[in-house]
């Protein structure tokens, strides 16, 4: 009888993408299994035509949040999963996991409901060399092995055809924005970098609808005439499909970095206030983290970043050598 698995990750886009490494691993060991995933409503498009997922459960956190969660919980109970894997540390999804009527449940010890999980793993952040995919993989080691796989998203053939028009000449992608100020390389510094990019390279600025203004300012203030802003114009999977074949992708410590990892696309990730040891860095074979070489007592200042630099100087961004970005071209 085929196994039934549910993976729960209802946090940000980047976290959801990283959780797909579990999908990859479970499928590699249990290719005939049913794998479902519970995510935040609005991110379903990431999994259009996904070859390994049976069903995506989308939790609406904005409208009747807990009423909808209760409905999801009842649905989950009716599935009789063999294993529910919860990679989050929050009570709401911990409840669904603990009382989801599964034969086995796995999650981290920091989840308030972990006392009811059948498999509880210590959650560690800041351990050198321990990536989020390694942390998450520990939840399924007992039915797979200790080696995590890279996250994977699967743009359809039609999506690749739709973005083909942007690939007629050699190009790079730049995703200049982040939800957090201290995780975002400043606009002036992106402009400084783009002014050093050779004119024969097409530059595509990527981002969501909220990033349109920033991308337009960067495009208009940079010297290059070969810069095109696609902010707000591409879906997440279309962006991933474009990033896959780029000469290089320049990103912050944010979701576009994880999109690039999902395609094993060449990546240069600029880390400002955060550090790679948190375990959320790029995973592509050709990927590097660019950061300040100076010693700053205030860095890292937090796991997720802040709306402004707590010290007021933002040296972790302004002290980065722009040539390290240029040298990756």
Task: Mark where each language-model region is.
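Catalytic machinery of carbohydrate-active enzymes
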Residues: 1-329
């Amino acid at each position: 009888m085929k196994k039934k698995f549910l993976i729960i990750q209802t946090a940000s886009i980047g976290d959801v993408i990283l959780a797909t490494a579990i999908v990859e691993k479970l499928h590699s060991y249990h290719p005939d299994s049913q794998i479902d995933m519970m995510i935040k409503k609005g991110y379903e498009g990431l999994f259009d035509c996904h070859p390994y997922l049976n069903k995506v459960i989308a939790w609406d956190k904005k409208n009747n949040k807990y009423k909808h969660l209760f409905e999801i919980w009842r649905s989950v109970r009716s599935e009789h999963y063999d294993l529910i894997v919860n990679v989050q540390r929050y009570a709401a999804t911990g409840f669904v996991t603990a009382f989801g009527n599964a034969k086995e449940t796995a999650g981290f010890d920091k989840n308030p409901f972990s006392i009811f999980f059948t498999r509880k793993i210590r959650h560690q952040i800041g351990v050198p060399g321990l990536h989020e995919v390694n942390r998450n993989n520990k939840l399924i080691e007992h039915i797979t092995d200790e080696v995590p796989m890279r996250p994977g998203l699967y743009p359809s053939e039609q999506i690749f055809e739709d973005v083909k028009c942007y690939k007629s000449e050699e190009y790079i992608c730049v995703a200049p924005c982040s939800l957090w100020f201290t995780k975002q390389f400043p606009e002036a510094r992106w402009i400084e970098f783009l002014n050093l990019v050779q004119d024969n390279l097409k530059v595509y600025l990527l981002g969501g609808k909220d990033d349109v203004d920033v991308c337009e300012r960067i495009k208009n203030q940079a010297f290059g005439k070969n810069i095109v802003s696609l902010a707000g114009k591409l879906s997440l999977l279309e962006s991933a499909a474009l990033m896959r074949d780029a000469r290089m992708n320049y990103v912050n410590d944010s979701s576009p970095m994880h999109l690039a990892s999902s395609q094993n696309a060449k990546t240069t990730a600029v880390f400002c206030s955060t550090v790679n040891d948190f375990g959320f860095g790029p995973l592509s074979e050709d990927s590097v983290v660019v950061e300040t070489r100076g010693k700053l007592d205030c860095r890292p200042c937090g796991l997720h970043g802040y709306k402004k630099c707590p010290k007021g100087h933002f040296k972790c961004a302004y002290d980065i050598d722009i040539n390290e970005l240029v040298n990756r071209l």
